């Protein structure tokens, strides 16, 4: 029976060699490499809308994108026989440092790598998915930092709305609506953001898609699939925006504040002070340092803590037993969703096909580091970078959903 060993069990010389695929045929290398990429592709939702850039020639550690400016309108009539002054083109550059990512699995000597093995194939499949998720998350976290943000208003009774100005004020009543979709699309149009064959794209979480599908104007993807090539994960269209669904769409939500409790409570009345006593949970010293908390509906940064006191960056006034919530998400610590509305060319990534590889080290390839030929390994590594190129070509709509009380940060 084959056994799967812990990742770090054999950490040492055997896992730091750089010789690649020793002992594997060229056909097997190609096969496993193709398998890795095929399993990575479905996870690369955020990467599929990026402007791709080849890895720098000569193995440089930074990648560079050029941004070209626009020309002013040429409104001056031409004079017969006179050549006018031409217009120069402004070019700016955006650079990003490349980073390498990777993972591997060590397996027992029961694995025979002289032919394509089901165990190796299964591990390669899993690592392909892991690679896709990893590199897609790197891209997602970069492009979630855009400056164009719309906060979903609170939807009240009878169609009333209350504006929201901060992420930490969003609730499960702040859903993504048809009106918000139209507003985001209009903002992109006003910035002359290029489209993807006449449509903008939005990447959303299934929890948000659940709410949006209730809109009568929603058009499911199967209704136009015959005439349009669908994006990976595409589920439908609304107001000229094609929606792509993924569980990797960004969720903002703070972790529990205590080892045994999500929230804490204020211990004793606080009058305009930065030090707040608390109880209601077990917290290690400085475990909350650098995090955000909500006290009385306002957000504060924790600069330090003991097992019974928080030191905040700003003085606070609070009543005894007021609840202290995690402050990285919405109101009362609920989940907030970052829905990315994108125009073409808004951001760039490096070409993944050039910088990724699967590495299979057969049993017996580690020399004296594995004297009994007991171990083999399967892994991947990849070089990646992502950058926002045109901030005005993307809008992030932050909203709640019917699942804001249960979804976790990702």
Model regions and ranges:
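Exposed beta-strand and adjacent loop surfaces of beta-rich binding modules
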Residues: 62, 199, 290-292
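Sequence/fold signature of self-assembling virion shell proteins
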Residues: 11-49, 162-187, 207-410
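Intrinsically disordered, low-complexity linker/loop segments enriched in Gly/Pro
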Residues: 129, 140-141, 147-194
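Long, contiguous amphipathic alpha-helices that act as assembly "spine/axial" helices in icosahedral shell
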Residues: 65, 91-155, 192-208, 370-383
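Residue-level signature for short turns and capping positions that connect secondary-structure elements
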Residues: 70, 110, 315-317
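N-terminal "assembly arms/tails" that initiate or stabilize quaternary assembly
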Residues: 2-97, 394
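A short, polar/proline- and glycine-enriched secondary-structure boundary/capping micro-motif
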Residues: 76-77, 87, 117, 319-325
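Solvent-exposed, flexible loop/coil residues
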Residues: 49, 53, 59, 72, ...
């Amino acid at each position: 029976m084959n056994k799967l060993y812990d990742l770090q069990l054999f950490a040492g010389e055997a896992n730091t060699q750089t010789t690649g695929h020793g002992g594997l045929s060229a056909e097997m290398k190609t096969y496993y490499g193709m398998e890795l990429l095929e399993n990575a592709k479905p996870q690369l939702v955020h990467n599929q809308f990026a402007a791709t850039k080849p890895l720098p020639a000569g193995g440089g550690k930074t990648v560079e994108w050029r941004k070209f400016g626009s020309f002013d309108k040429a409104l001056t009539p031409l004079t017969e026989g006179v050549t006018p002054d031409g217009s120069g083109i402004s070019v700016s550059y955006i650079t990003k440092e490349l980073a390498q990512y990777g993972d591997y699995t060590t397996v027992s000597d029961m694995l025979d790598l002289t032919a394509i093995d089901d165990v190796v194939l299964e591990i390669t499949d899993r690592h392909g998915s892991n690679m896709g998720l990893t590199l897609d998350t790197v891209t997602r976290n970069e492009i979630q930092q855009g400056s164009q943000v719309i906060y979903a208003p609170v939807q009240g009774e009878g169609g009333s709305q209350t504006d929201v100005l901060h992420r930490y004020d969003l609730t499960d009543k702040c859903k993504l609506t048809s009106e918000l979709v139209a507003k985001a699309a209009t903002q992109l149009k006003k910035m002359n953001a290029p489209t993807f064959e006449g449509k903008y794209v939005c990447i959303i979480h299934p929890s948000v898609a659940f709410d949006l599908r209730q809109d009568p104007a929603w058009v499911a993807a199967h209704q136009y699939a015959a005439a349009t090539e669908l994006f990976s994960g595409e589920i439908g269209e609304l107001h000229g925006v094609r929606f792509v669904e993924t569980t990797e769409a960004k969720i903002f939500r703070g972790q529990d504040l205590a080892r045994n409790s999500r929230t804490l409570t204020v211990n004793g009345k606080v009058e305009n002070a930065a030090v707040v006593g608390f109880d209601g949970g077990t917290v290690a010293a400085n475990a909350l340092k650098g995090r955000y908390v909500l006290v009385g509906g306002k957000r504060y940064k924790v600069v330090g803590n003991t097992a019974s006191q928080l030191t905040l960056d700003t003085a606070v006034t609070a009543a005894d037993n007021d609840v202290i919530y995690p402050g990285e998400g919405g109101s009362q610590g609920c989940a907030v969703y970052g829905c990315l509305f994108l125009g073409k060319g808004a951001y760039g990534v490096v070409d993944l096909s050039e910088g990724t590889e699967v590495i299979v080290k057969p049993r017996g390839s580690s020399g004296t580091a594995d004297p009994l030929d007991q171990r083999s390994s399967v892994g991947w590594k990849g070089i990646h970078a992502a950058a926002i190129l045109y901030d005005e070509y993307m809008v992030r709509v932050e909203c709640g959903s019917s699942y804001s009380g249960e979804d976790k940060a990702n």
